[in-house]
């Protein structure tokens, strides 16, 4: 695992857990804006950068390593934390453990543990792994699932970006793919969570509301203090990557009030 630090001159501390299946540069716009106000710690998961050896193991290991890293750097509390999708799963566990207090947290389309029978969870894993591999191998499927005219980053050439994304997805090992989906959907949480004073909001894009219904129900039950907020006209993880300025307006509205 690697953690990039931005905005070291700032006093307020932000932990940023990205989603999976996206390279570091997909978050450059958001991180550039956030680092103007925040000392930001951006997590890069194992198995997610070709130049870094190793496989992604689990949400649990990631949270333990992030917590240990920050404490070693003298960080004993965070002013803010953000996690998207798999990153939302990591943030949910970090909050639940209560070992690193957080003042305010945004769980953006965060994945929560399934409560299905074991056999059904194994079948879901098979579906997810096969789906990822099909997208990674087929440019046509990739563009059908994520139309370039909608999901190309601002200022980027669509063909060049999708060439880079297609090549990037092929760098994921079979072990990393399996562990991302299994751990992301089945990570352990304490019941009940540790007592925490964090203000929590769960974001979802309006276009992913149906897919997030189970996650929303879980968060409402597990963190009763959490607010639920829909982002108009957005799909999963679209706001943070494609619209960094708008993302930061939503971010500041919650974090800086």
Go through each PLM region and give its residues.
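Conserved HGGG/HGGXW glycine-rich cap/lid loop of the alpha/beta-hydrolase fold
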Residues: 4-52
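Flexible "cap/lid" loop of the alpha/beta hydrolase fold
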Residues: 96, 102-134
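Acidic beta-to-alpha connecting loop that harbors the catalytic carboxylate
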Residues: 20, 206-208, 233-235
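Gly/Ala-rich beta-loop-alpha elbow adjacent to hydrolase catalytic centers
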Residues: 82-91
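Conserved serine/cysteine hydrolase catalytic core
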Residues: 175-221, 230, 240
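Catalytic histidine-centered segment of alpha/beta-hydrolase-like enzymes
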Residues: 231-246
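Active-site loop/oxyanion-hole signature of alpha/beta-hydrolase fold enzymes
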Residues: 41-82
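Conserved alpha/beta-hydrolase catalytic His-Asp/Glu region
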Residues: 116-117, 137-194
């Amino acid at each position: 695992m690697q953690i990039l630090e931005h905005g070291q001159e700032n006093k307020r501390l932000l932990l940023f857990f990205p989603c999976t299946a996206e390279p570091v540069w997909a978050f450059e716009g958001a991180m550039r804006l956030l680092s103007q106000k925040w000392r930001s710690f951006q997590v890069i998961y194992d198995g997610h950068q070709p130049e870094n050896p190793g496989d992604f193991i689990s949400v649990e290991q990631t949270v333990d390593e992030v917590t240990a890293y920050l404490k070693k750097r003298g960080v004993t509390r965070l002013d803010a934390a953000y996690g998207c999708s798999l990153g939302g799963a990591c943030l949910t566990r970090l909050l639940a453990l209560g070992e690193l207090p957080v003042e305010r947290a945004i769980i953006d389309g965060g994945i929560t543990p399934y409560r299905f029978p074991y056999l059904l969870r194994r079948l879901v894993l098979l579906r997810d792994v096969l789906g990822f591999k099909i997208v990674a191998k087929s440019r046509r499927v990739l563009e059908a699932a994520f139309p370039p005219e909608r999901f190309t980053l601002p200022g980027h050439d669509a063909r060049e970006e999708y060439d880079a994304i297609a090549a990037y997805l092929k760098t994921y090992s079979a072990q990393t793919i399996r562990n991302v989906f299994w751990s992301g959907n089945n990570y352990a949480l304490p019941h009940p969570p540790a007592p925490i004073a964090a203000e929590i909001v769960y974001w979802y894009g309006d276009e992913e509301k149906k897919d997030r219904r189970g996650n929303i129900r879980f968060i409402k039950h597990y963190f009763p203090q959490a607010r639920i907020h829909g982002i108009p006209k957005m799909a999963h993880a679209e706001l943070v990557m494609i619209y960094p300025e708008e993302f930061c307006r939503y971010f500041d509205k919650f974090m800086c009030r």
